[in-house]
């Protein structure tokens, strides 16, 4: 990275770090006066970032640093998280859960597409919303768009809902733990099956427990890996008219997933010294909080209106359906 590029990202990165520091201080104040942190620093960072964006929108010079913090730092955090998980955890998950995840994705795409069509969304828009909701948000939308020949307006409108709904899910999903009496294991699986993006799983599960973080990330990674087969199916359905435009390998398998798996393999093979594991876990957590601050800075609440009522309603109903399907899978598998 050149000196000029570093200069370009410093304002946005600095603002994200400042919000992170404020969030961590507020968390400590909570702990001091309330006995515990009812809102974790991760959540506070999102709320503060969104408030800053809404009340005093940062100028263009902050954009590159905000994007850098929200994307690359969060991807690094996910990759580092692999160091806290061993391959035995994947084996213990069992084939039933893996096949169940695939089934949830398939059913969710079908239901979401049906909801979109019932609400009179165009075919391509309905496909984009369905894949974004059921697999991995913006990444799935971006990967699917060239396969089905979606227009840029369709992509922009489909992506608009993920910013707001993604944050809402991260903030509200932990409330289901006491409401539904979910165990840490059940909640981790639920988060992995419903949260849009891999990094957001960290934010949705960290306030609950480390076990929820680990299980949620594993489940979400399996869910993301469904993107390849789903794109292949839609490519076959769409025919040859879009065959000249194919998503690249890193759209189907993002680099941070490979990094996560590599770190997990190193941990499983005992190639990472136990003494540095706490430092790696802390670095992952800190980068995640910084990224959540940046995510909040990138959320424009007014984007929901620009996306259109039908798209928003489709996304909300699809998300509710996905939650119900996921809870059904957890019940069927007898997860305690």
UniProtKB/Swiss-Prot annotation:
Signal peptide: none annotated. InterPro entries: UPF0324_pro (IPR018383). GO terms for cellular component: plasma membrane. Keywords: Cell membrane, Membrane, Transmembrane, Transmembrane helix. The chain crosses the membrane at residues 9-26, 36-55, 68-90, 94-116, 128-150, 160-182, 189-211, 221-240, 247-269, 279-301, 313-335. It is found in: Cell membrane. Coiled coil: none annotated. It is a multi-pass membrane protein. The keyword Hydrolase does not apply. Its main location: membrane. Belongs to the UPF0324 family. PANTHER family: INNER MEMBRANE PROTEIN YEIH-RELATED (PTHR30106), UPF0324 INNER MEMBRANE PROTEIN YEIH (PTHR30106:SF2). This is UPF0324 membrane protein BR0028/BS1330_I0028. It comes from Brucella suis biovar 1 (strain 1330).
């Amino acid at each position: 990275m050149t000196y000029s590029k570093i200069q370009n990202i410093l304002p946005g990165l600095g603002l994200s770090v400042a919000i992170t520091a404020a969030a961590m201080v507020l968390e400590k104040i909570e702990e001091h006066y309330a006995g515990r942190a009812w809102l974790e620093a991760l959540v506070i960072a999102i709320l503060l970032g969104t408030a800053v964006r809404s009340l005093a929108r940062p100028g263009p010079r902050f954009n590159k640093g905000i994007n850098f913090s929200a994307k690359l730092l969060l991807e690094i955090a996910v990759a580092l998280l692999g160091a806290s998980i061993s391959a035995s955890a994947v084996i213990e998950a069992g084939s039933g859960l893996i096949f169940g995840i695939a089934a949830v994705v398939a059913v969710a795409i079908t239901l979401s597409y049906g909801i979109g069509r019932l609400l009179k969304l165009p075919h391509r828009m309905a496909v984009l919303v369905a894949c974004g909701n059921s697999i991995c948000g913006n990444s799935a939308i971006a990967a699917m768009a060239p396969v089905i020949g979606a227009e840029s307006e369709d992509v922009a409108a489909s992506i608009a809902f993920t910013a707001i709904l993604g944050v809402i899910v991260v903030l509200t999903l932990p409330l289901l733990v006491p409401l539904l009496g979910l165990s840490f294991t059940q909640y981790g699986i639920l988060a992995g099956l419903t949260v849009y993006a891999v990094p957001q799983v960290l934010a949705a599960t960290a306030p609950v427990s480390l076990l929820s973080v680990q299980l949620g990330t594993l489940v979400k990674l399996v869910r993301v890996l469904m993107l390849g087969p789903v794109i292949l199916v839609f490519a076959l359905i769409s025919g040859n008219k879009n065959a000249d435009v194919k998503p690249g390998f890193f759209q189907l398998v993002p680099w941070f997933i490979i990094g996560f798996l590599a770190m997990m393999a190193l941990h499983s093979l005992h190639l990472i010294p136990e003494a540095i594991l706490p430092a790696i876990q802390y670095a992952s957590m800190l980068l995640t909080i910084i990224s959540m601050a940046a995510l909040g800075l990138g959320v424009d609440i007014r984007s929901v209106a620009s996306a259109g009522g039908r798209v928003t309603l489709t996304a909300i109903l699809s998300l509710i359906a996905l939650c119900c399907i996921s809870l059904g899978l957890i019940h069927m598998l007898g997860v305690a």
